[in-house]
Design a protein with these regions (language model features):
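Short, ordered loop/turn segments at secondary-structure junctions
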Residues: 27-28, 64, 113-114, 135-137, ...
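Acidic, Ser/Thr/Pro-rich beta/coil linker or hinge segments at domain junctions
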Residues: 89-92, 164-197
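Active-site-proximal betaalpha loop/short-helix elements
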Residues: 88-151
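Active-site glycine-rich loop that binds ribose-phosphate moieties when present
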Residues: 36-49, 82-100
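Short hydrophobic/aromatic beta-strand micro-patches
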Residues: 39-41, 155-159
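Short, conserved charged micro-motifs
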Residues: 2, 47, 160-166
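Short, compositionally biased
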Residues: 69-87
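Glycine-rich anion-binding loops of enzyme active sites
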Residues: 1-73, 172
Length: 197
């Protein structure tokens, strides 16, 4: 009962924050199985797609990578006062950022499967490559955080004239269809990330 009450309150809170009405539900006896479906109608000229990145666009993110990974680790170690735990248990939706960049970003993806793995989806969909400046990536613990999932940040590409101080510039889109990792600090990483199948 307590778990159900907490879950219901969480759904109610989120639906209120994002103004998404809860319009139905179905209860049956059996193993716990929760599915949530959200329907909406997009503004066609403001849809953020994976495709659309152009040669010369800058690759950006808006926060440190690896925060959720650190939160999970702290949770497993019993560090209940860690500020990173909420990044793992209660990730914030990037709706406001999405709205902010919807008219300037040429492509976009969330980083739930790991920054480099998800960036690869943009590059493949856009038929381009990238130079990634490893020294510029704001990581939480170490450079391997760029392969950590569950961060739910947005990785996006934008032309130079739309850059903002609040964006971390981590690379540049290139015509060459490969990914070149650049580091003067000697960082050496492989592109991994979560694989669904």
């Amino acid at each position: 009962i307590d778990w159900y009450r907490n879950f219901s309150n969480g759904v109610k809170e989120i639906s209120k924050i994002y103004q998404i009405p809860l319009i139905g539900g179905d209860f049956t006896k059996g193993q716990l199985n929760i599915n949530i479906i959200v329907y909406g109608e997009p503004f066609l000229d403001k849809i953020l797609k994976r495709s659309g990145a152009n040669d010369g666009d800058f690759i950006c993110i808006s926060k440190q990578v690896g925060r959720a990974k650190k939160g999970l680790k702290d949770l497993q170690l019993g560090k209940t006062n860690s500020s990173f735990i909420d990044d793992y248990l209660r990730p914030e939706s990037k709706i406001d950022l999405g709205k902010e960049i919807s008219e300037i970003a040429t492509s976009c993806i969330d980083t739930s499967d790991g920054l480099l793995a998800d960036l690869k989806h943009i590059l493949n969909s856009s038929n381009v490559g990238a130079e990634i400046y490893l020294d510029e990536i704001p990581f939480t613990q170490n450079i391997d955080d760029i392969n950590a999932g569950d961060d739910y940040d947005l990785c996006f590409t934008i032309p130079e004239n739309y850059l903002k101080d609040s964006f971390y510039i981590i690379g540049k889109v290139t015509k060459n269809k490969s990914i070149k990792l650049i580091s003067e600090k000697g960082y050496d990483v492989e592109i991994n990330g979560y694989k669904h199948f």
